[in-house]
Amino acid sequence: MAEKMEKTGQILQMQLKRFSRVEKAFYFSIAVTTLIVAISIIFMQTKLLQVQNDLTKINAQIEEKKTELDDAKQEVNELLRAERLKEIANSHDLQLNNENIRIAE
């Protein structure tokens, strides 16, 4: 078994010796390039996930603000109901004049 391992090691050494320095440099550069590309892909995927997460948070905040705005508009509409204004005017012995009512947006 040890002889077989030794023979395999010798075969690999012989094959490596067969390659010239240029070929070794070429294969080394391919390996380094492959490694750099793999690391870059992982980095970009991580950044993409972070951006998607940030986008989701911002969209949630936008929806929350829209809901707050809709609630505020609803409250303004409820406060400007004609019946409510008449009740307030009557309770303070005032006369309701519709020309003096303005809606702020």
Curated annotation (Swiss-Prot):
This protein's GO CC annotations: cell division site; plasma membrane
Location(s), subcellular: Cell membrane
Function, in words: Essential cell division protein.
Keywords recorded for this protein, A-Z: Cell cycle, Cell division, Cell membrane, Membrane, Transmembrane, Transmembrane helix
Spans traversing the lipid bilayer: 25-45
Record bears the keyword Magnesium: no
Main location: membrane
Topology in the lipid bilayer: Single-pass type II membrane protein
Ranges per topology, Extracellular: 46-105
Cytoplasmic topological segments: 1-24
Signal peptide (UniProt feature, chain positions): none
Protein family per UniProt: Belongs to the FtsL family.
GO BP terms, alphabetized: FtsZ-dependent cytokinesis
Gene: ftsL
Protein's UniProt name: Cell division protein FtsL
Record has Membrane as a keyword: yes
